[in-house]
Amino acid sequence: MNVARQDSRRPAGEATGPDRRRWLGLAVLAAMQFMLVLDVTVVTVALPRIQHDLEFSGPGLAWVINGYVLMAGGFLLLGGRLSDMFGRRRLFLAGVIVFGAASVVCGAAVSPAMLVASRFVQGTGEALAGPAALGMIPLLFPDSRERMKALGVWGGIAALGGTF
């Protein structure tokens, strides 16, 4: 029996396309990566207000951006290795929780030190979540054609985060 005949005998309610849960998983991973990249650049818009409200010095204000980038870049490889050792999903969730909690603290910061410290923690969350998210895509999409599409979607949405 050929494949075309087998496909024509499937029940009408059975899904014939790609598994939607995988694409939903990709949407979650891409949305989080969008937020991680967005968080690097979105602060620049708020810097004058942050400087005024929290009475930052000029050099101190640079640490609002640099703290995040330093931790994210500095621990990116470690985050990837930890996700290999302890599981990508586990590290992704840990990174999201760390990032989210630090974001709340950033929003509630009442001093320059509190804001800078929480930006360092946000960068650490990014270093955990980012590599784990990228590592989950090949697991969700074992077929090379679908994987390339998924990586394109993930990368494109992540790049959009830097434009805001």
Give short role names for the model-derived ranges.
Residues 2-164:
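Transmembrane-helix bundle of Major Facilitator Superfamily
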